[in-house]
């Protein structure tokens, strides 16, 4: 489920649709709770994630974690609640250096892939800040704040957290954009 693949099929003349797997508004739903976490992340501890989170913590941006150091309690309600209580949820696109089975072992591959996390977060009524990936640029354009290194991430977090009006404007436009990818919207097209 990658928007880049969708475009490649369309270029070849095939009928194609981008169908995100993580876009069900009945699973990922906004729960009206107080935003008690400034910045959060849910997911596994891999690639550069720990380095970025540590850098934020060292610079007085506390990152609340779910499933990072232990097996996550992932059921849809707990995850929606966790996201809904956060002002910002981080998304990391970097898969890390990996050797693929078809490549020579001396060639390292570092992928910046599409993750469904931004859509999940937006459906819960929360803002996401994402590591850059080409797919996110296609889907969200300027509606999704992005970063390419830990310094940019810190700067973006500070800018958003220190300006409530800017935060609300950004969050509302991001959430509206995410709703365009919700299952019940694109099912009608198919």
Question: Model segments located where?
Answer:
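A charged, aromatic-enriched C-terminal amphipathic alpha-helix characteristic of glycosyltransferases
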Residues: 161-190
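Conserved aromatic
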Residues: 115, 147-148
């Amino acid at each position: 489920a990658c928007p880049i693949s969708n475009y490649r099929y369309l270029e070849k003349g095939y009928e194609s649709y981008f169908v995100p797997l993580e876009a069900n508004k009945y699973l990922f739903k906004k729960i009206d709770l107080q935003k008690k976490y400034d910045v959060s992340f849910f997911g596994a501890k891999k690639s550069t994630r720990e380095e970025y989170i540590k850098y934020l913590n060292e610079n007085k941006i506390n990152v609340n974690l779910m499933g990072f150091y232990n097996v996550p309690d992932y059921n849809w309600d707990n995850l929606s609640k966790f996201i809904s209580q956060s002002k910002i949820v981080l998304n990391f696109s970097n898969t890390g250096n990996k050797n693929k089975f078809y490549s020579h072992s001396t060639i390292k591959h570092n992928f910046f892939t599409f993750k469904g996390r931004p859509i999940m977060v937006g459906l819960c009524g929360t803002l996401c800040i994402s590591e850059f990936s080409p797919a996110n640029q296609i889907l969200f354009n300027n509606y999704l704040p992005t970063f390419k290194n830990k310094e940019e991430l810190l700067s973006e977090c500070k800018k958003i957290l220190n300006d409530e009006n800017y935060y609300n404007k950004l969050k509302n436009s991001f959430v509206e954009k995410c709703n365009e990818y919700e299952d019940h919207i694109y099912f009608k097209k198919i």
